[in-house]
Amino acid sequence: MTRADARENRARILEVAREALAEDGTTSMNQIAQRAGVGPGTLYRNFPTREALALAVYRLEIDQLTGSVPGLLAALPPREALRRWTTDLVSAMRRKHGLGDALSPAGHQSATDQSYGPVITAITRLLDAGKHDGTIRPDADPRDFLQLTGALWRAATGPEDRSQPMLTLILDGLSTHPGKAR
């Protein structure tokens, strides 16, 4: 197998695991290998445990999320970029919560510890852009923002999902002109 094939297998395993574990946190490693079209040996060579696989899925998600900030800021006004990014953050946190069956308490803590710095850096960039254009209050703190958004991913999903109205309240609280640029 070439290195390119190995990279493709790893990427396919991660994508399948991301979907499978989000659907059902109890999905077995063998089921993931089957869905990814790889043998169990390939799966276990890349990810020796379910927890290692779940942590890799989460790391990939955080990398994609934090890596999206420059593109959002290039395409959108800062407040709208912050809204879109935060909506994606909420989805990622809900999926992380869905990994509960695959992660031990130590695994959850490891995921949180590894993601905190990059997430705070991303929030800082988004808030700083809004501060620079005058739409975000100068005293907005990325750590406070992250704490506030914790309630969003815990909000009910489905028809009772209140995360978007709650996000509007948070953004209005950060705004130099509440109620504008929704």
Label each residue range with its predicted role.
Residues M1-R35, A52:
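Basic, helix-initiating cap at the start of DNA-binding domains
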Residues M29, G98-S104, T135-A140, G179-R182:
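Short, hydrophobic secondary-structure boundary micro-motifs
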Residues G37-F47:
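Short hydrophobic/aromatic patch on the recognition helix
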Residues E61, W85-L89, S115, V119, ...:
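Hydrophobic/aromatic residues within well-ordered alpha-helical segments
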